[in-house]
Every structure is written in structure tokens, then in C-alpha cells.
């Protein structure tokens, strides 16, 4: 919507979480995974351009899970410093080690990044995601005016996912929104205070591989959300976790994930080239 002045947009900073490598031994993968862009910042350049094109936001904090015992991570750190100076972003370094559990180090990076956010709202964005379409900020404003605390942008279509224990239903706020009982780290806009409260759920949990619950901060957060869903009334649960999906029921994905897990590298390269051609 051209010319629309969004209250939420005017009070939102971007928080980007990044790493050069990570320990995934809890998933049965022996060698550390390396972020496809590291030690360069080429992909981050594309992420920033995408954020500017699709949502008009580049006021960013970049929180770096820095493995101090990893050569690639040390080179990436210097490149990140140069990138942040050039793109006017604030860099937060969260030191860790390849010997440490990834859920622990990622959670620390999330928390340190959130503490650097000074705006009322935050757009959380991991370093390997792109928006596929522009965001209608009037819908975003409507969501938060209606009491939503966290508005997710889906990597999949807006339907229930029984295998993930996610229930998606139309929202009473707008037919351009859906209710969901599910938290994940796919890009979302949230009230910063609500986001900090969720991250504190992860901070208090013992790091382990969570199976259905997710491998990073999603794991302990979703375990607590699910426990409350079992034990609270629907009204109490929605008051505690006012989470929504952007778009109507059945809407197509808003997000593309260029992840680093085995088998995704070819898809990442193909999708990135395709996106670059779109301009």
C-alpha cells in the first residue's frame, strides 16, 4: 500500500542471527556445519537488499554466534565488522565454541541480540531467509492493534500441520490473518517484550536434542507452549500466547529458506540464482 504510514513499521528494528559454523552432533552429524556464505557476507548483502525491497526495513542488529576456536568464524567476524560499518548495522558478538551444544550457543546469541533491541517491535530474521513477497503493513498494524504479540511469516502454506502439532485457524481479528499455536524461528514481527519473555523460556531449559520440538530456541519454547496448551483453557492459552500467521487460511508461503542442512545446498544455490534473476 503506497503512502501508508505504519505505526508498527516506524517502531521496528531487525534482529538478524548469524553464524559461520555450528556443532550439530546432537543430530547425529559428526562434522560441524558451515554456513554457505561464510566467511564472506555476500548472502547477507542479498538478505539486506531483500529486506529493503520487500518491507522497507534495514535498521538492524546482527547477533553473531562466534565460535572462537574456528578459523572460518574468525575471518567471518572481520567481514561482518566491515559489512556492518558499510550497511550501518550494529554488530553484537556472542562468543562460543565448537565444543558447545548448538542450542545453548544459539540461545545465547538470540538473547544478546534481543537485549540490544531498543524498539517496541522486532523483526527476527535468521541469515538464510528471504521474503518472497512484499508485506502489507496495514495488515501488520491491524494484527497488533487486535492484541497479537507475535506475527509469523510462513515458510509453508497457512494450513494445519498435524506432523508438527500445529493448528491453524482463521483469526477473529481479520480474514488476512490466522491463529496458530506454534512458535518457530522463521521470520516474524513481535512485540519486543513478548519476544524476550519467550526467549527466557529457552534460557532456563537444559540443552538437548528436542526431536519434534526443534533444535534451537524453538525446542524449550514449544515444550512450554505445548504444556500450557494441555493445561490451560483455550482462552487462557490465547491470552498467554497471542501468536498469528500473516495471510489468510491457505495462503502460500511468504518465506524462502536457504538452509545449510545436508541436501539443501543445491536447492539453496538454485533458489538464490533464481531470486537474483528476478531483481
Locations of the language-model features?
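Short, acidic, metal-binding catalytic loop of nucleotide-sugar glycosyltransferases
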Residues: 36, 46-58
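Conserved donor-nucleotide/metal-binding helix-loop-beta segment in metal-dependent transferases, i.e.
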Residues: 133-158
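A conserved hydrophobic helix/loop-capping motif in glycosyltransferases and polysaccharide synthases
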Residues: 12-40, 54
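Short loop/turn segments at strand-loop or loop-helix junctions that form parts
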Residues: 14-24, 64-66, 93-96, 126-128, ...
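Active-site-proximal specificity loops/subdomain of glycosyltransferases
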Residues: 30-31, 65-117
Amino acid at each position: 500500500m503506497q503512502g501508508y504510514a505504519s505505526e508498527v513499521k516506524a517502531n521496528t528494528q531487525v534482529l538478524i542471527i548469524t553464524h559461520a559454523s555450528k556443532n550439530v552432533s546432537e543430530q547425529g552429524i559428526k562434522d560441524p556445519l558451515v554456513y554457505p556464505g561464510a566467511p564472506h557476507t555476500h548472502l547477507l548483502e542479498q538478505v539486506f537488499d531483500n529486506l529493503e525491497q520487500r518491507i522497507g526495513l534495514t535498521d538492524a542488529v546482527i547477533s553473531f554466534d562466534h565460535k572462537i576456536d574456528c578459523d572460518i568464524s574468525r575471518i567471518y567476524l572481520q567481514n561482518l565488522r566491515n559489512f556492518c560499518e558499510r550497511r550501518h548495522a550494529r554488530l553484537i558478538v556472542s562468543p562460543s565454541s565448537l565444543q558447545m551444544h548448538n542450542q545453548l550457543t544459539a540461545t545465547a546469541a538470540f538473547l544478546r541480540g534481543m537485549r540490544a533491541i531498543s524498539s517496541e517491535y522486532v523483526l527476527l530474521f535468521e541469515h538464510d531467509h528471504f521474503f518472497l513477497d512484499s508485506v502489507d503493513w496495514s495488515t501488520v498494524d491491524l494484527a497488533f492493534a487486535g492484541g497479537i504479540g507475535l506475527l509469523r511469516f510462513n515458510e509453508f502454506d497457512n494450513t494445519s500441520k498435524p506432523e508438527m502439532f500445529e493448528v491453524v485457524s482463521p483469526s477473529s481479528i481479520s480474514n488476512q490473518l490466522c491463529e496458530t499455536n506454534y512458535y518457530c524461528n522463521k521470520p516474524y514481527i513481535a512485540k519486543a517484550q513478548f519476544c524476550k519473555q519467550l526467549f527466557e523460556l529457552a534460557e532456563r531449559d537444559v540443552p538437548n536434542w528436542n526431536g519434534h520440538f526443534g533444535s534451537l530456541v524453538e525446542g524449550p519454547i514449544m515444550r512450554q507452549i505445548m504444556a500450557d496448551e494441555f493445561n490451560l483453557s483455550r482462552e487462557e492459552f490465547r491470552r498467554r500466547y497471542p501468536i498469528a500467521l500473516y495471510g489468510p487460511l491457505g495462503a502460500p508461503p511468504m518465506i524462502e529458506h536457504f538452509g545449510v542442512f545436508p541436501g539443501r545446498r543445491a536447492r539453496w544455490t538454485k533458489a538464490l540464482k533464481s531470486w537474483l534473476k528476478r531483481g
